[in-house]
UniProtKB/Swiss-Prot annotation:
Record: active site: 43, 104, 130, 158
Matches recorded under InterPro entries: Aldolase_TIM (IPR013785), DapA-like (IPR002220), Schiff_base-form_aldolases_AS (IPR020625)
Cysteine pairs bridged by disulfides in the record: none
EC number from the UniProt entry: 4.-.-.-
GO BP, one annotated term: small molecule metabolic process
Keywords annotated in UniProt: Cytoplasm, Lyase, Schiff base
Keyword Lyase attributed: yes
Protein name: Uncharacterized DapA-like lyase PYRAB12600
Protein's cellular compartments: Cytoplasm
Similarity comment: Belongs to the DapA family.
Top-level taxon in the UniProt lineage: Archaea
PROSITE patterns associated with the record: DHDPS_2
Molecular function GO terms recorded: 2-dehydro-3-deoxy-phosphogluconate aldolase activity; 4-hydroxy-tetrahydrodipicolinate synthase activity
Length: 294
């Protein structure tokens, strides 16, 4: 497991039901571009606004459509619900699950450890721990190291953490477990992650600009670092969409619409998609893509 993995948006119709036709179009588009994996029920996919049945239905439909590597997010505030969703993902043939630390209630380190341990003991499917302290309880590197060394099915981490020190410490876990995978969740950290010894990225801007991520990946693999750095600067510019929008999902969906993707400007309540002013700002930011060869 490596490379460019896309945390999918969840497209909705005007009545807030899941738009499975748009979902299928999007997955087909991304696989034709050559991404290395698809990830549903992600933060960008507004998983917290979906009920359990919808999350299972989305996971099932995504598995039917996706021909390549396929991940399902199974995070929740309830450890028992995580186990239920993880078993479901295993049953439908997902290649792995992504589990964020519980959110809303502040937890002690021992509780975070228990959460991941209980899930790992009850499923066989490969698990990626998701660290995103802006949205959930922070996951110390020591906990990630401990569970990855104790449980063979905990195979990696996705880190949406604005800290190169944290990222480097995660990559050092690979010295103790050679097959441990480290992915960044931040587009602007993609090249840095690869240079430090990481394995790829699970990045939201790849929903609408996978060509940039794939060109960075391919340039890095060819050791064309000059080209990779140039493209990384473009990706950093594109990442500014997060700064002008009110949420990841709003930023990415508006960027997709600006590029002509067949999705509707709808977020699940209570979230509201940003208006014309933000949309125009995002269109301006995306002009940096115009000079990049596909």
């Amino acid at each position: 497991m490596e490379g460019v993995i896309v945390p999918l948006v969840t497209p909705f119709r005007e009545d807030y039901s899941i738009d499975f036709e748009a979902l299928e179009w999007h997955i087909r588009f991304l696989e034709e571009k050559g991404v290395h994996g698809i990830f549903v029920n992600s933060t960008t996919g507004e998983f917290t606004s979906l009920n359990t049945d919808e999350r299972k239905m989305l996971a099932e439909k995504g598995r039917e459509i996706t021909s390549g590597m396929y991940l399902v997010g199974t995070g929740s505030t309830s450890t028992l619900e995580v186990i239920e969703l993880s078993r479901h993902a295993e049953d439908i043939g997902a290649d792995g699950i992504v589990i964020v630390a519980p959110y809303y209630c502040k937890l002690k380190d021992e509780e975070i450890l228990k959460h991941f341990s209980m899930v790992a003991e009850r499923v066989d499917i490969p698990i990626i721990v998701y660290a995103i302290p802006s949205c959930a309880n922070p996951v110390p590197v020591d906990i990630i190291r401990k569970v990855s060394l104790e449980y063979s099915n905990i195979i990696g981490v996705k880190a949406s953490v604005d800290s190169l020190t944290y990222l480097q410490e995660l990559i050092e876990v690979k010295e103790e477990r050679k097959d441990f995978r480290v992915f960044t969740g931040l587009d602007q950290y993609f090249l840095s992650t690869l240079l430090l010894g990481g394995d790829g990225g699970i990045m939201a801007c790849a929903n609408f600009a996978p060509e940039i991520h794939l060109q960075i990946w391919n340039s890095f693999k060819r050791r064309n670092f000059e080209e990779a750095i140039k493209l990384s600067r473009v990706l950093g510019e594109i990442s500014r969409i997060y700064n002008v929008a009110s949420s990841f999902a709003s930023a990415v969906k508006l960027a997709m619409i600006a590029k002509g993707f067949p999705i509707k400007p709808v977020l699940r309540p209570p979230h509201v998609i940003d208006g014309e002013e933000v949309f125009n700002e995002i269109k301006g930011i995306l002009r940096s893509l115009e000079n990049v060869k596909p």
